[in-house]
Amino acid sequence: MSVSQQLSELASKEKTVLYVADQNLEEVLCFPESTDRTTLVQLTDACLHANELAKHLEFGKPLSITNQYSRGSCVLQIAKEKKDGSGMVVSTTIAAHNALRGALKCSNALDQVISQL
């Protein structure tokens, strides 16, 4: 079974949305691949929350976010360049959805984007 098949299977079983950047922290890969409106809204919401939270707290660049809707939690991985430029430090945060939303509730830009979906 390929990696993409494994990720897709995990995503469907756990009602999980995976958002992952590549090694250059640029390209984004999302599972499950879906055109379902509800799933796309949840996925966009999760990605925006991860990016805005990281930016707001100056954490670095989001590397991946795993949203476990069935468990009501997010696992957020952030990559930040070391001060001496010798590589990246990756930190992992586990938070409830409400905690992520609470940290960003003052973000009008985020609300505007979500309301347009």
From Swiss-Prot:
GO terms for cellular component: fungal-type vacuole membrane; Ragulator complex. Induction: Differentially expressed during meiosis. One of its GO terms (biological process) is regulation of TORC1 signaling. This is Uncharacterized protein tam1.
